Amino acid sequence: MKREREAPSRAFSALRLAPFVYLLLIQTEPLEGVNITSPVRLIHGTVGKAALLSVQYSSTSSDKPVVKWQLKRDKPVTVVQSIGTEVIGTLRPDYRDRIRLFENGSLLLSDLQLADEGTYEVEISITDDTFTGEKTINLTVDVPISRPQVLVASTTVLELSEAFTLNCSHENGTKPSYTWLKDGKPLLNDSRMLLSPDQKVLTITRVLMEDDDLYSCVVENPISQGRSPPVKITVYRRSSLYIILSTGGIFLLVTLVTVCACWKPSKKSGKKRKLEKQNSMEYMDQSDDRLKPEADTLPRSGEQERKNPMALYILKDKDSPEPEENPASEPRSAAEPGPPGYSVSPAVPGRSPGLPIRSARRYPRSPARSPATGRTHSSPPRAPGSPGRSRSASRTLRTAGVHLIREQDEAGPVEISA
């Protein structure tokens, strides 16, 4: 009974192992496919230049391979697809005129751009082959580093200062890495030496005399390297002499500022005096200008007096006070004896005592010059500003005129008694 039961179970186990045996037989047969190799897995490219993504494949088939290059992104980008070296389809605009394929499947990408950086995958298949070969190559694209420089606020520093900063600067370059050198050797680790996260800035805290040296920086990226010229940092020791000189300089500076502050008000007062002097001069000039019309008017009146002396005499006579009575102008007394054979008529009542008595019989008068005209022409013109002299001259003219009239009256005709 036991033997009969074991026979069916063995047959069932053999049936279960049959597929695995078949698979083992298949694996032991030689496989036909494409084998791809590449001399490099990483290529560094420069912007504007070309990069060769080199591969080689091997196959038992003599047919042309189907080659496909892709740039791996979140969504793969097909760069080119071809049969042999003949491109299939249309290239993307950003790859047009920049792609070239070789018979071994290699890709030449010219005029590199920063956007070309990434991982490229190639697939090569042959229709007769069962399997397709694949290979990936990484491409980096960078800008060369320009010559760097070390920037410092000052090349001199005082010992035990708070901090001193050095900055490594350069204009061009991508993916830079910085290294600091002291006297041409890499900077040793020191608690006083602090580097920024990108190591571009070096800060020395609590400067010591041993920090007096040459400093430089090295900048590099995958395709280039640059080294800055060394910068000499001079550290001065603190001393009593330096402190004294510093104190003296501060004192002189404060004194200079004080003197300048005191000098400014004096300049303002000087300007004020000058302004007052100018105002006074302008006032005097204005006063002279006001007096000039009056001075010009007075001489004109003198000229008018010269042209019309009689009018001047009449005006002056009216304006001048009454002249004093001259005893010489009084008439001769009636009791005064006349010449023999003549009788004098008595004075007419009501006449002014100053007027001469005229006789009934008249004789022709002797010609006489006009006293006013002669006197007026002989008198000089009145000067401006001398009224007293003009009045005395008018009085003299009036007195002279009265005398002449009296003389003419006295010399006039008298009655002859029969």
From Swiss-Prot:
InterPro entries: HEPACAM_domain (IPR052280), Ig-like_dom (IPR007110), Ig-like_dom_sf (IPR036179), Ig-like_fold (IPR013783), Ig_sub (IPR003599), Ig_sub2 (IPR003598), Ig_V-set (IPR013106). One of its GO terms (biological process) is immune response. Glycans are attached at N35, N138, N167, N189. It is found in: Cytoplasm; Cell membrane. The keyword Glycoprotein applies. Residues 262-418 are cytoplasmic. N-glycosylated. The modification Phosphoserine is found at S280, S352, S379. Residues 34-141 form the Ig-like V-type domain. The chain crosses the membrane at residues 241-261. Residues 1-33 form the signal peptide. The cytoplasmic domain plays an important role in regulation of cell-matrix adhesion and cell motility. This is Hepatic and glial cell adhesion molecule.
